[in-house]
């Protein structure tokens, strides 16, 4: 099992303009987001994702398929076509994971995975549920 943790952040200045590449000031928080990854052998290769809130309840669950690399394309992640619960979160996660694959072609290359994330803070607080997720995925994909 592989574990990652990233601290949340409290933006002091530039809360919205930072998205347009403006300088901002932030301080890390004690609370953050955990990510646990279990690898296993399964065909077709799959990625089972479960996100827990600070209350321990699942707020997102999705099964993804990892498509094999071809001569012209890297591996890629897609939502399971049979999944009933595809949504914006799933589509955003697909984009993030595929970007990570484009930066490291060996990422998600040969196994199936079970990923569980857990926030230590309420998602509505604005402490960085997305940025801590991206940081954890970056660490995993290195």
Describe these PLM feature segments.
Residues 125-142:
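DPxDG-like acidic metal-binding loop motif
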Residues 1-125, 139:
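ATP-binding N-lobe of GHMP and related small-molecule kinases
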